[in-house]
Amino acid sequence: MKIALVHDYIKEYGGAERVLEALHELYPQADVYTSLYLPSYLGPHRARFKSWKIKTSFLQYIPGKAKLISPLRLLSPLAFKSFDFSGYDLIISSATGAYFPNSVRKNSAQLICYCHTPPRYLYGYATARQWKHNVLLRIIGETMNHILRIVDLNASKNVDFYIANSLEVKARIKKFYRRDAVVVYPPVELDLQKETKGQERAYFLTGGRLARAKHVDVIVQACSELGVPLKVFGKAFAGYGEELRKMANRKWLMVDGVKKSTIEFLGEVDDKEKLELMRGAKAFLFASEDEDFGITPVEAMGQGTPVIAYRSGGVKETIEEGKSGLFFDQLNKESLIEQLKVFDKKKLKEEECIARAKKFSKERFFKEVASVISKKTA
């Protein structure tokens, strides 16, 4: 069976790209199609895709394309329609909700969509909102979004079967597309896990994609006010990193005789560094709004690190309250501070966190995806 994998674009390495990587591991002979491939923006993750056979669209040849990701979504349906899938038996789209990969001309192939979420910006979910402050941009943006909702709905009809990455996303698919879906949770790397008993856990940790919808500012403000040490890792977008640094406090701690800020920004890190950070953290803090699934909190649990998360979206499915983590109910620093103050008293256990994370292993993902696809292509 000849298989093609289709992904919106490859410019950053997040949860969706981890799923694409796992699909490619499951189907190593599959060709990969994407509208744009920008390896220079992938940082320490660039090598992951180096040996892949990646086919790009005409968008790859547009000057300044890296800074035009948002406006280029208007051309993305044409980009995916431009690919020739004749001769393929199966197309698996990894649809992040950024572009419209389900617009492909599938010919005689079957199209199965692994849906990370319907486009958040089209259906009222948390995303970048700065453009709405400008009246003219808001009028233009809302008009284009109306057109793109029609495009998205038409593309959804092209899909033969949906796989959702969480119950949260399954409900969105039903609500906006009137389609059923089976849930297969994304794969989480657990094989690098090490024994952490006796290791000092001296700080709180947050990180991942530092976008505004992740609300890292709430975490920075809460930890600043309490004066507790916080490490922040990840790539920042659209000037958000500078905003976070400006709001970070000017309180200092003495560490080995050296005066250091309580808030430390580490930038982008590779997987080994990330897991080491997680193993040394008291808890991983997560304030994302309407999160589709949330791989990073599960990775933290896999290192025996509990999670304190905003009660929203997919993390409600992954965190066992009182066992592998805690929730705060209001998206503000005061609500998070309440949980930070009682965290030590809860005495959450490493083994509970690890046991929970194992339910989201890569091996489980391989087995479930292969089973679904086998049944649907039989």
Protein language model annotation of sequence segments:
Residues R73, L78, K345-K375:
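A charged, aromatic-enriched C-terminal amphipathic alpha-helix characteristic of glycosyltransferases
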